[in-house]
Regions:
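Short beta-strand segments
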Residues: 57-59, 95, 119-124, 131
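Short beta-strand-loop/turn "lid" adjacent to the catalytic site in phosphate-handling enzymes
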Residues: 41-81
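Short, acidic/small-residue loops that bind anionic groups at enzyme active sites
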Residues: 78-100, 149-151
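N-terminal phosphate-binding loop and adjacent alpha-helix
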Residues: 15-45
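A short helix-loop
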Residues: 1-9, 114-116, 122-123, 129-204
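A glycine- and small-aliphatic-rich helix-loop capping segment at beta-alpha/alpha-beta transitions
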Residues: 2-7, 71-82, 87-89, 107-114, ...
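Conserved phosphate-binding catalytic cores of ATP/NTP-utilizing and phosphoryl-transfer enzymes
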Residues: 89-119
């Protein structure tokens, strides 16, 4: 809420069966569709009544590049478009990646960085990128990939290692708890090729 400066967030992990490393897109679409109404109910319950919404922001694809597409993004985009049309308010669309970058800037109280070039690292289950970010007239920020992982992404590596240990996906939190009690530290170095990393060797 830009007037009260109130910021609310509700979230719920999508269910993944034990031993599996994620969801198929068809299952992800189903669970997004099923859980979105519940999330909206919780959000407005925590807000405390009817909200005077003046705009909607939504991630409609993974990255702002041609061909970037995942079906599960249609769930949020469709709901945002319906709400925008019904309420007569603008729907502002951006990528999932830019959403992560802006969230990091906001949490660090550095949103002013969108007015100047900066470097961002996007490290997740599907992405391990070094990104050059700069102001843009056509987008919130323009993102150019400098370096990436050529095989496994960092989050994939963590989850695969966790599943080998019998942990439940997503494995990051449980793996971190195990590491707190580790008896030794093992150093490992990623293979680099033309400035990009290869992480699959860690799994082996």
């Amino acid at each position: 809420d830009s007037d009260s400066k109130k910021l609310l967030s509700v979230k719920k992990l999508l269910p993944v069966k034990a031993g599996e490393a994620g969801l198929r897109q068809s299952d992800a679409v189903f669970h997004h569709t099923k859980q979105l109404p519940e999330m909206f109910g919780r959000l407005f319950s925590e807000y405390g009544g009817k909200a005077d919404i003046t705009a909607i922001g939504v991630s409609f694809r993974p990255r702002n590049i041609d061909g970037s597409y995942m079906p599960c993004f249609l769930c949020g985009e469709g709901l945002a478009d319906c709400m925008g049309a019904a309420m007569g308010i603008p729907v502002m669309k951006t990528s999932h990646q830019i959403g992560h970058i802006l969230a990091a800037l906001f949490s660090a109280d550095k949103l002013s960085h969108i007015n100047e070039p900066f470097i961002a690292f996007h490290v997740s289950g599907g992405t391990t990128d070094c990104l050059y970010c700069e102001p843009s007239e056509n987008e919130l920020i323009k993102v150019t990939e400098i370096s990436t992982s050529l095989d496994l992404k960092a989050g994939q590596l963590i989850d695969r290692a966790g599943l080998m240990l019998g942990l439940r996906f997503p494995c990051g939190a449980e793996l971190e708890r195990l590491s707190d009690n580790a008896s030794e530290t093992v150093k490992a170095r990623a293979v680099m090729k033309n400035g990009c990393c290869c992480l699959s060797g860690f799994e082996n």
